[in-house]
């Protein structure tokens, strides 16, 4: 579902709780982007993969699923592209 910005802006002006929730969500997205930039620029391959798996585990737990056992639906190539690593590095 897509809501035009103007409509969302008008609604959030009339509903302070909506504005607060939007700010919280946007803040979380910005923080996630900053964390990814740090991950890609400062961490070695093993640390990148560790953080990736940890974050997946945390997200599964937040949604009520097992944080210890889950299926990775991404291919090794997809994970490598996401983390800036080669498929060979991911396979090790």
From Swiss-Prot:
Localization per record: Cytoplasm
Binding-site residues for [4Fe-4S] cluster, renumbered to this chain: 1
Cofactor(s) the protein needs: [4Fe-4S] cluster
A Pfam family hit: Crp
Cofactor-binding details, from the entry: Binds 1 [4Fe-4S] cluster per subunit.
InterPro entries for the chain: HTH_CRP, RmlC-like_jellyroll, WH_DNA-bd_sf
Inducers of expression: By anaerobiosis.
Keywords: 4Fe-4S, Activator, Cytoplasm, DNA-binding, Iron, Iron-sulfur, Metal-binding, Transcription, Transcription regulation, Virulence
Subunit organization: Homodimer.
Name of the molecule in the record: Anaerobic regulatory protein
Protein species of origin: Capnocytophaga ochracea (strain ATCC 27872 / DSM 7271 / CCUG 9716 / JCM 12966 / NCTC 12371 / SS31 / VPI 2845) (Bacteroides ochraceus)
Source lineage: Bacteria, Pseudomonadati, Bacteroidota, Flavobacteriia, Flavobacteriales
This protein's encoding gene: fnr
């Amino acid at each position: 579902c897509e809501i035009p910005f103007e409509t969302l802006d008008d609604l959030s002006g009339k509903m302070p709780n909506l504005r607060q929730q939007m700010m919280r969500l946007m803040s979380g997205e910005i923080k996630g982007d900053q964390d990814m930039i740090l991950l890609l620029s400062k961490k070695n391959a093993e640390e990148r993969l560790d953080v990736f798996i940890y974050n997946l585990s945390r997200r599964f737990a937040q949604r009520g699923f097992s944080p210890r056992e889950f299926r990775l639906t991404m291919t090794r190539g997809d994970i490598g592209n996401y983390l800036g690593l080669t498929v060979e590095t991911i396979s090790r």
